[in-house]
Swiss-Prot record:
The gene is cemA. It is found in: Plastid, Chloroplast inner membrane. Contributes to K(+)/H(+) antiport activity by supporting proton efflux to control proton extrusion and homeostasis in chloroplasts in a light-dependent manner to modulate photosynthesis. Prevents excessive induction of non-photochemical quenching (NPQ) under continuous-light conditions. Indirectly promotes efficient inorganic carbon uptake into chloroplasts. The lineage of its organism: Eukaryota, Viridiplantae, Streptophyta, Embryophyta, Tracheophyta. This is Potassium/proton antiporter CemA. GO terms for cellular component: chloroplast inner membrane. GO terms for biological process: potassium ion transport.
Length: 448
């Protein structure tokens, strides 16, 4: 609203200035036409009444009501003198030598006045031309602003941008130009390169290439900023929520419930086996230390006390470990739920992020695209990938508090990469082979 008011004010000021220039030009022309406020009677003396008339006009113009009119008058009189020399020289033969001296002085005065009048009028014309250039530049700038305002929707604040996010990520259409831009282009049967080429060709034929370039630049800039901001907001919100939920109420509530409402120490059999193994190793080390130190049999009671203390310490450690496992599990559930809610709320931002990632990928060269696909597939489903999957699955199971079961891990490693390989091949066959066959050819060549 403020932008429209400013543009209207500039337009009215421009119109007012133009109108004032037209009025002044009209008055100057009118003064040139009606430039005889005195009677110029040329008698036997060549120009005496002209000098009297000039003095009379200067007296009349003492209030500076008509600036530079005297110069215009001199210019018109001298011009008429040069155009009609016979009229001014019909009594020249009857003049004496004194009249010739007066005539020469009058001629010099008229010539000087003529030169000064021409200089002043040239200065005025230069000023008018400079002012017209400035007005033309202002008018052209306002026209460009008007075209830009109709071709690209500008949001005045971030809140307004969030409220109108659906309009921003849908189709941006110009009222004056048939330019159509989209923040997200879904994959269809017709390749996007063909539709973009046809759209660009149509726009260039209609003379709207400047607006198209401006729209594409602003749209790409907005997509990049919106995607980076969205990723940063996701990471920040997830970390803040998980940290606050863990420290504020989950940890105290789980600790109180685990220590008072139930009598278990271990969550699963894996923890019990690991605790028993550590206790046996500790007893063996204590017996070995006493044998090496040649302790007497009377000190066996002290050994039982040490074993009891170590057992209590192990129980405390595993009890805290069980609390941490439950805490991590609940925190992960809260983080996943929060992430799903953020995805649902920010569906438009997620679409922009998807479009930005696709644009980054498709903007690469064919060799870089094939290299990226080959690197990703080798990491996930390559020859050495099962060892990595075993480490990842084992760490995840330990994070959730489950036992390190080799059969489950081997079953997962033998099935999941196969499914992932099938998905990759389908994606390459379904999309890349249709959009860019050169990428598929380069990928197969590098893979072989």
């Amino acid at each position: 609203m403020e932008f429209n008011n400013s543009v209207s004010t500039i337009y009215w000021s421009l119109l007012e200035r133009k109108f004032s220039i037209y009025v002044l030009t009209f008055l100057n022309r009118l003064k040139c036409i009606l430039s005889n406020p005195f009677s110029i009677s040329f008698s036997n003396n060549k120009y005496p009444s002209f000098f009297n008339a000039n003095k009379t006009f200067l007296k009349r113009d003492s209030c500076n009501l008509f600036p530079n009119q005297s110069n215009i008058m001199f210019f018109l009189v001298v011009l008429s003198k040069r155009l009609c020399p016979n009229y001014f020289n019909n009594t020249g033969e009857k003049k004496n030598r004194g009249d010739n001296i007066n005539d020469s002085s009058g001629n010099r005065f008229i010539d000087e006045s003529y030169v000064s009048a021409r200089k002043s009028m040239s200065k005025e014309s230069n000023k008018i031309k400079q002012m017209n250039r400035k007005l033309a530049w202002i008018e052209a700038t306002l026209n460009d602003l008007d075209i830009w305002r109709h071709s690209y929707s500008v949001f005045s604040s971030s809140t307004k941008m969030e409220n109108n996010l659906e309009q921003q990520f849908s189709v941006l259409e110009s009222k004056d130009t048939p330019i159509t831009m989209m923040a997200y282009e879904s994959i269809s049967l017709v390749p996007r390169s063909i539709t973009r080429t046809l759209s660009r060709f149509k726009t260039e034929l209609m003379g709207d290439s400047n607006s198209l370039i401006l729209n594409e630049f602003r749209l790409a800039k907005y997509q990049a900023l919106a995607s980076i901001q969205y990723i940063g907001c996701l990471l920040f919100i997830l970390s803040i929520i998980s940290m606050l939920s863990k420290t504020m109420f989950l940890k105290s509530w789980i600790t109180n419930w685990w220590n008072t409402s139930q009598s278990h120490i271990f969550l699963n059999l894996f923890q019990e086996e690991r605790a028993l193994k550590e206790l046996q190793e500790m007893e063996e080390l204590l017996w070995l230390d006493r044998v090496m130190a040649d302790y007497v049999k009377d000190q066996s009671q002290d050994l039982d006390i040490e074993i009891y203390e170590e057992t209590i310490q192990l129980v405390t450690i595993y009890n805290e470990d069980s609390i941490q496992i439950i805490l991590h599990l609940l925190t992960d559930i809260i983080s996943i739920v929060t992430l799903i809610v953020l995805f649902i709320i920010g569906r438009k931002r997620l679409a922009v992020l998807n479009s930005w990632i696709q644009e980054l990928f498709y903007s690469l060269s064919d060799t870089m695209k094939a290299f990226s696909i080959l690197l990703l597939t080798d990491l996930c489903i390559g020859f050495h990938s099962p060892h990595g999957w075993e480490i990842v699955i084992g760490s995840f199971l330990e994070h959730l508090g489950f036992s390190h079961n080799k059969h489950i891990i081997s079953c997962f490693v033998s099935t999941f990469p196969v499914i992932l390989d099938t998905v990759f091949k389908y994606w390459i066959f379904r999309h890349l082979n249709r959009i860019s066959p050169s990428i598929v050819a380069t990928y197969h060549t590098m893979n072989e």
